[in-house]
């Protein structure tokens, strides 16, 4: 079983974004900070999610269960409905990755409970820009 946490941070006035990805497997953590192309927070949250699932796919077997955590309501709702009016292209890429695993459980969590990925995203934002 893999636990995946993602979060994004955006400097709204400048349009810079970064992401934090936290992967937990067998009590080991993989912490990843990434520079994102997105220039607003919603795009950045989808991009961070996509990058998180790409990283998990690199290290997980197809028969693994992935438990995904996000504090982005729009990402969570879109994943559950498998529909996003303005983000369908990004969503389809994420769903394709999710469908490659035997089971993915999506969870919405509060900002406070997503502190690990949040801190990584903030650190990345300040180190990249």
Give the positions of each predicted feature:
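Short amphipathic alpha-helical face segments that pack within enzyme cores
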Residues: 43, 47-51
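RNase H-like nuclease fold core
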Residues: 1-43, 55
